[in-house]
Amino acid sequence: MKKTYQYAIACPTSMGVRITPPERMAVQNSNLFYMQATSAETNVLNVASSLGRECLALTKFVKGSPVADFIKRQLRARNIRFEGLNIEQGGPWGYRHQFNIADSGFGLRAPRLWNDRTGEVGRTLSIEDFDVERIFGQEGVGILHLSGLIAAMSHETTECCLALAKAAKQYGTLVSFDLNYLSLIHI
C-alpha cells in the first residue's frame, strides 16, 4: 500500500437530489420539500470528510444544469472533492441527475423511497472519464470504495468499477465493496 496519499477514500458514484417533506409529513400531504444532494457512495465519504480526511467522488454532471450546480455546492460544503465530466443534456429527454422522493415515515407509516433514475447521467460512467494514473499513482488513494448500487446501474458502470478496482490494486490502494442491498430500490 502506498505510504502517502492525498485522498483517504475515493468512490465512483452517480449523484442526484432527494426531496423530503418537513417534519415527517407524508409526501402526498406536503407542498414544501427539503432538497439535498445525495448518493449512497458519498454518504460513505461523508464520514471520513467529517473527520477532516480528504475524499474524492468520481462522477458525471449535466452541463449547465442548476441541479448539477446544486450538487457541486453541496459536495463542497461537505468537504468532498469531485471529478467528473460535464455532459450535454441532449434535449428535454436527454441526461439528468437521479431524483428521489423520501417519506421519513411516522408512527405506523413506514419510511418509503421513490427513485426516478431514467436518463441518469451517472449510468454512463467510464474509466476513460478519469486520469487514473494521476489519481491513484501521483496523488494516491488510501481506499477505493465501491457500492453494489453503482456497479449494477449499467453495463458501463460495471466495467468502470472493475477497471477502477484493477487500477487500485495496481497502485496498492485497498478496495472496499458494499453490496448495499435495498429491497425497495428500483433501478
Give residue ranges: language-model regions.
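Glycine-rich phosphate/adenosyl-contacting loop at the front of the ribokinase-like
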Residues: 2-85, 127
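Conserved small/polar residues in nucleotide/adenosyl-binding loops
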Residues: 185-187
